[in-house]
Each structure stands twice: as structure tokens, then as C-alpha cells.
């Protein structure tokens, strides 16, 4: 259940109550693709990093270790040791981006595993069954992730099929949630808005999926190479047609500036691999902008990564030490950097919420939508 607390323009301060805990919004989901944050960060660590929600990947967990294995271990939360909410994506994005030799029809998609090439079929029912086995808090509907930009006629055809798939997802989830053998009988379902960058298709598709009265709604198919301004335009066009009483999730976004801009346009929830992926290569997010800790100028720098940060990394280690760890190939350097970046992202959303609570979001936006894009 979503509760809207207050608004500042289009920006929304709210809460989303789930069977596994309440999520303060706007919020960021920490990406644990295969049930773990890449970079050696555990579920225990996440507690100290202000993580609210963990996002796991249906496609990858289905292939390894297998959703039935996870189910036999009590579901994804028990399996990973994370007791908060977990969102699983449907596997659609990976099917259309990683898998080989795809064949799509009304029933679903046949594809070859990117690991060993064996044939797999996934459709709405299969995606819901896998996510039910994983016992996540929130399941994402199975959709077609088309290229951006895509031809207008194919985009329309794809969105119509995705809507039919969504209705099948809802019916299958209702069935699964009624079974005695289901671990999480209160699993929630989010639908995904698609439509490439076409305003009319995006709006028509949003009008369709909102009629199904789902637990939440996502904007998909963005942050895949289009200019940021085009992404913002699509959000602005779709947002007025999204239900006020449901959370809005922008999938796969993004940079700190992207997040601030999207919050200003009415988005509540985000996920992105950027904080962990960038950290593994020495790219650090700070309140002054981003930095590359591998640069020679940090060799004798005794300051923490960010003097405004009180994460475990910044409270205990210097830039010089972390640079040394990276240069020496020590895994600890990657781990400390990932912990810092995740803490930064979670704190960014915390500060956004505080600014909305204090009616100072306009000032926050004016300051940080510029500063956080800097390279230092």
C-alpha cells in the first residue's frame, strides 16, 4: 500500500508498505543481481549502508543456482540473509539483451542461455512461477524490452503484446498466491510501461496498464543510450497518467543527477548498477562530484573519499590507502569503494526525502543537480 505524505511540485514524499517492511520514498534499490552485491558486500553490510530494498535478477537466479533451489532454502530473503523487502525483475531485460537466438511469439520467448547455450522458454506464466519460487516481496511483470529507438509500428505491436502478457502475469500471480505451497502468498506485482520514445504509445500503454489496479507501476525501456533530456521528456509525458496512489519506479536509473531530475518529475523508486559497477573500477561518488581514485594526485592524500560522508569506509580509511589497494590488486579496495558508493546513493535519497519533508527540495535541486555532475 502506498501513502502519499506530501508533494513539492511533482516531487513526491511517500511510503510504501510491503509484507516485508515499509519503504521510505523516494528510495533506491541496491542491485544484488545473483543474490549478492558485486564487490564483496553482504546482506549484513547493507544494514550499515542504509539499504531499504534489495533487487535480485530472475533470469540469472533461474539459471544459477535455480529458482527451485532458492525455494527449497526458504526463498530469496532467507537464502541471502536479507530480511527486508526484495524486488525481482521479470527476466525480460536479460532475455532481450543477454540471451542468444531469441524467438518471440504470443506465448513468450524461446532463447539460448548465455552461459551454456541450452534452450529456455519464458513467458508471463513462467516468469511469475520463477518469481513465486524466489518468494520476493515484489515481482515485475514480464515484458518485451525493445530497442530504443524502435520502429513506430513494431513499438505499438510490442506494447499491445506486453499488455496481454501483463494480464496473464496478474492471473498467474493470483493463482500462485492462493496455493498452500507458496512461500509468499502476499507477493506484489508491478506493471511496466513501454513505448520507446513515442509519446502517444507511452500514454496509451500507461492508460491500459493502470486499469489493472496493480501494486505499483514502472517506466521501462529508458536509460538505454538515449540522451538524458529525451528520458526526462518521456517521464514528463507519462507521469500525469500514472496513478497517484501507487509507487512509480524508473527502471535502471541512474546517475545522481538523473535521480534528482526524475524525483523532480514525480518518480519514487530507482535501481542502478552504477554505484557498485563504477566503484569496482575506482570511480567514486562524492558530494562534490565524482572522482577517479586511481589518479596520481591521490597517492599521498590523507583525506577520506568524501569529507561529508560518514560511511564505514570514510570513517576509517584514506584516499591514499584505497588507491594503494586498487593499485596492488587487493579485493579490499573494491569492497571499500562499493560500500562507499552504495552508502552515498542511499544517503542521497535520504537527503532528498529530508528536503521534501522540510519544504526545501527546490533549494536542494538547484544546488545538487549541478554539483553532483562535476568531475573532481
Which functions belong to the PLM regions below?
Residues 1-183, 296-299:
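Non-catalytic, usually N-terminal nucleic-acid engagement modules in DNA/RNA processing proteins
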Residues 148-151, 156, 216-222, 331-334:
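Glycine- and acidic
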Residues 21, 162-169, 209, 238, ...:
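Hydrophobic alpha-helical packing residues
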Residues 21, 54, 89, 131, ...:
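Conserved, mostly hydrophobic/aromatic
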Residues 160-163, 172, 176, 184-305:
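Glycine-rich phosphate/ribose-binding loops and adjacent secondary-structure elements
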Residues 172-182, 246, 352-364:
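Surface-exposed helix-capping loop/turn segments at secondary-structure junctions
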Amino acid at each position: 500500500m502506498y501513502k502519499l505524505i506530501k508533494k513539492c511540485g511533482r516531487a513526491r514524499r511517500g511510503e510504501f508498505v510491503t509484507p516485508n517492511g515499509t519503504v521510505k520514498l523516494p528510495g533506491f534499490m541496491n542491485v544484488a543481481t545473483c543474490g549478492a552485491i558485486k564487490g564483496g558486500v553482504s546482506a549484513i553490510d547493507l544494514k550499515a549502508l542504509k539499504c531499504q530494498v534489495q533487487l535480485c535478477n530472475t533470469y540469472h537466479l533461474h539459471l544459477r543456482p535455480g529458482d527451485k533451489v532458492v525455494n527449497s532454502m526458504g526463498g530469496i530473503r532467507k537464502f541471502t540473509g536479507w530480511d527486508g523487502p526484495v524486488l525481482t525483475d521479470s527476466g525480460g531485460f536479460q532475455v532481450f539483451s543477454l540471451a542468444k537466438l531469441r524467438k518471440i511469439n504470443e506465448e513468450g520467448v524461446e532463447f539460448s542461455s548465455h552461459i551454456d547455450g541450452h534452450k529456455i522458454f519464458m513467458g508471463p506464466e513462467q516468469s511469475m512461477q520463477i518469481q513465486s519460487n524466489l518468494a520476493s516481496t515484489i515481482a515485475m511483470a514480464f515484458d518485451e524490452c525493445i530497442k530504443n529507438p524502435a520502429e513506430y509500428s513494431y513499438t505499438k505491436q510490442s506494447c499491445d503484446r506486453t499488455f496481454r502478457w501483463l494480464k496473464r502475469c496478474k492471473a498467474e500471480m493470483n493463482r500462485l498466491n492462493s496455493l498452500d505451497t507458496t512461500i509468499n502468498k502476499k507477493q506484489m506485482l508491478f506493471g511496466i510501461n513501454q513505448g520507446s520514445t513515442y509519446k502517444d504509445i507511452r500514454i496509451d500503454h500507461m492508460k491500459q496498464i493502470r486499469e489493472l489496479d496493480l501494486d505499483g507501476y514502472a517506466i521501462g525501456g529508458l536509460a538505454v543510450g538515449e540522451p538524458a533530456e529525451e528520458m526526462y521528456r518521456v517521464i514528463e509525458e507519462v507521469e500525469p497518467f500514472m496513478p497517484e496512489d501507487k509507487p512509480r519506479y524508473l527502471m535502471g536509473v541512474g546517475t545522481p543527477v538523473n535521480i534528482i531530475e526524475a524525483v523532480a518529475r514525480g518518480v519514487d523508486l530507482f535501481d542502478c548498477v552504477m554505484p557498485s559497477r563504477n566503484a569496482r573500477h575506482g570511480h567514486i561518488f562524492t558530494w562534490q562530484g565524482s572522482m577517479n581514485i586511481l589518479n596520481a594526485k591521490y597517492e599521498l592524500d590523507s583525506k577520506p573519499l568524501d569529507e561529508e560522508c560518514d560511511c564505514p569506509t570514510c570513517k576509517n580509511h584514506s584516499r591514499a590507502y584505497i588507491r594503494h589497494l586498487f593499485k596492488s590488486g587487493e579485493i579490499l579496495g573494491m569492497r571499500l569503494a562499493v560500500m562507499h558508493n552504495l552508502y552515498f546513493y542511499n544517503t542521497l535519497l535520504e537527503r532528498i526525502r529530508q528536503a521534501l519533508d522540510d519544504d526545501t527540495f527546490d533549494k536542494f535541486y538547484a544546488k545538487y543537480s549541478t554539483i553532483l555532475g562535476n568531475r573532481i
